[in-house]
Amino acid sequence: MTSSSSESRTYPPRPILAVSAAIFRDFRDGRVLIVRRARPPAHGLYTLPGGVVELGETLQQAVVREIREETGLAIEPVVLAGYREAIVRDGAGRIERHFVILPFAARWVGGDLVLNEELAEARWLKPAELSALDTTEGLAAIVSTACERIAALG
């Protein structure tokens, strides 16, 4: 992520718009890049790489930038794969975090996989392998939708 402060993402006055990507090296192979978070939010969980949309960015620009920053990969966003809301409450019931996340199905087009400090690990996995991992809520459904939408494009 760039210079946006993480403090403004805790106890936000409104939902925060974010993007992520189910990145495929080869759509026929079906393996998708799954990463494990090295810090909050979702510390230690497997998920899709991505991050917050910055003011003035389109969703596609944001997902390309975030993936490059977090993984070193160049991608081509192909199609939206649904949406997800992540709402986390603290012990007093106050909303600590509220993200609206728009995941893309994307094609890897270049770059070498180099993780930044936000990520602890990355794996290219088949969707069926996700059930063995501790993942963010809804990850398997998002990856499944990404696969379906890619297949529908032919």
Enumerate the predicted regions with their spans.
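Nudix hydrolase/Nudix homology domain
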Residues: 112-154
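A generic structural micro-feature
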Residues: 11-15, 45, 94-100, 119
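Conserved beta-strand segments that form the floor/walls of ligand-binding pockets within enzyme
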Residues: 18, 47, 103, 124
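Conserved Nudix-box catalytic region and its N-terminal flanking loop in Nudix hydrolases
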Residues: 29-70
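Conserved N-terminal beta-strand and adjoining loop/helix that marks the start
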Residues: 2-32, 83, 105-107
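Active-site segment of metal-dependent pyrophosphate-handling enzymes
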Residues: 72-110
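Short loop segments at secondary-structure junctions
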Residues: 25-29, 38, 107-112, 127-129
